[in-house]
């Protein structure tokens, strides 16, 4: 019996590392952001972040915004758009606890037919077990 336990202990380091229960990965954060953006759900996008830097039309990019102000500006930003597609194009952890997600957005402004493209860069920080949005930048 003790030999079986010993062999089981030897095999443990060979197992792949899995996130602990309740811990999210940067890929999970990217998927949640994609769903929130597609649904124009600003609250879900901001999540539990307390401050977010927004570099989008209609927002002053010089300072972080509180959660409620960021949500309101994102709602205004989403309002005139009708989504046509949103793809995650990159997910990178640039250093431990700091990562970014790049999304390509296709949309039309309500009442028009011109398809527009935009790249969104989302910056994340790992706080505890969750990746939290700290920055959202838009580039045409």
What are the residue ranges of the model-derived segments?
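Short, low-complexity N-terminal intrinsically disordered segments enriched in polar/charged residues
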Residues: 2-4, 9-12, 18-39, 47, ...
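Residue-level signal for cytosolic alpha-helical hairpin/rod architecture
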Residues: 27-31, 56, 85
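A short, structured loop/turn motif at beta-sheet edges
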Residues: 40, 91-98, 124-130
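A short gly/proline-enriched turn/hairpin at secondary-structure junctions
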Residues: 54-64
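Solvent-exposed loop/turn segments at secondary-structure junctions
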Residues: 61, 107-109, 139-140
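Short beta-strand edge/turn micro-motifs at domain boundaries
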Residues: 114-140
């Amino acid at each position: 019996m003790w030999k079986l336990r010993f062999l089981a202990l030897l095999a443990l380091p060979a197992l792949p590392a899995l996130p602990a229960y309740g811990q999210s990965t940067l890929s999970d954060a990217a998927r949640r952001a994609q769903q929130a953006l597609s649904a124009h759900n600003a609250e879900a996008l901001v999540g539990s972040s307390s401050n977010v830097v927004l570099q989008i039309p209609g927002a002053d990019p010089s300072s972080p915004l509180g959660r409620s102000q960021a949500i309101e500006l994102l709602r205004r930003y989403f309002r005139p758009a009708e989504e046509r597609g949103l793809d995650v194009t990159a997910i990178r952890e640039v250093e431990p606890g700091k990562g970014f997600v790049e999304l390509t957005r296709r949309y039309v402004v309500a009442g028009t037919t011109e398809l527009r493209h935009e790249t969104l860069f989302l910056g994340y920080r790992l706080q505890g077990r969750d990746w939290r949005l700290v920055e959202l930048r838009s580039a045409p």
